[in-house]
């Protein structure tokens, strides 16, 4: 399976880079709703190897970045950038959590046991190993979506008015607050309440700048 995707990765990265040049800045980030009821601490998820169920309440007091990911997406170039973000912001209490999903273009086709191998040898390849926590592959939209994503989506406006081509979207029913594509991001504050939501093509450098600006209110050094 890995050989099947390897040749296409560089092409995908090139196309995504071109698309980002035309992305309107005002669409890159939205602030989440005020007066949200509930927190992420009511939820949890199984790690990628299925050996541990992590309750998100263990991240109380931290700033948590939720990302839905896919190894064979053109945006997989964000993986090493997310590694760098995790390393650079960990002393600020920022934690990255990644959730593989196959609902957008069928770009995460592997089993849980194959995902890390795909990241290491194919996309992004070059021996890549994530420094942040990955969870089991699952849905972020539709009838079987993970409950934490139901909460995140209900807490924040969508980043775009358009859902995209239905031929590349694999869930039902479709709703206005659904995640649009791989690598959308939600920042949750130290009280467990969502703060910001980024469009999937927003550069990780922009996400980092937005987070650093947000952290100023906490006088974090």
From Swiss-Prot:
GO terms for molecular function: glutathione peroxidase activity. Expressed in olfactory epithelium and embryos. One of its GO terms (cellular component) is extracellular region. It is found in: Secreted. Residues 1-19 form the signal peptide. The active site is at residue 73. One of its GO terms (biological process) is response to oxidative stress. Pfam families: GSHPx. PROSITE patterns: GLUTATHIONE_PEROXID_1, GLUTATHIONE_PEROXID_2, GLUTATHIONE_PEROXID_3. The keyword Flavoprotein does not apply. Belongs to the glutathione peroxidase family. This is Glutathione peroxidase 6. It comes from Homo sapiens. The lineage of its organism: Eukaryota, Metazoa, Chordata, Craniata, Vertebrata. The gene is GPX6.
């Amino acid at each position: 399976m890995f050989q099947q995707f390897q040749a296409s990765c560089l092409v995908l990265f090139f196309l995504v880079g071109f698309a980002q040049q035309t992305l309107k800045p005002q669409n890159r980030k939205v602030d989440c709703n005020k007066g949200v009821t509930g927190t992420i601490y009511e939820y949890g998820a199984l790690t990628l190897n299925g050996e541990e169920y992590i309750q998100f309440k263990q991240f109380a007091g931290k700033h948590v970045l939720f990302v839905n990911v896919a190894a064979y997406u053109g945006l997989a170039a964000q993986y090493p950038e997310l590694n760098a973000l995790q390393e650079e912001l960990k002393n600020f209490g920022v934690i990255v959590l990644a959730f593989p999903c196959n609902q957008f273009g069928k770009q995460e086709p592997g089993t849980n046991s194959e995902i890390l191998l795909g990241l290491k040898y194919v996309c992004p390849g070059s021996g890549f190993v994530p420094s942040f926590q990955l969870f089991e592959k699952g849905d972020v939209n539709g009838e079987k979506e993970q409950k934490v994503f139901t909460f995140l989506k209900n807490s924040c406006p969508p980043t775009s008015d358009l859902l995209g081509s239905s031929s590349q979207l694999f869930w039902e029913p479709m709703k206005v607050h659904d995640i649009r594509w791989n690598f959308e991001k939600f920042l949750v504050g130290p009280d467990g309440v969502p703060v910001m939501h980024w469009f999937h093509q927003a550069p990780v450098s922009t996400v980092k700048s937005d987070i650093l600006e947000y952290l100023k209110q906490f006088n974090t050094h």
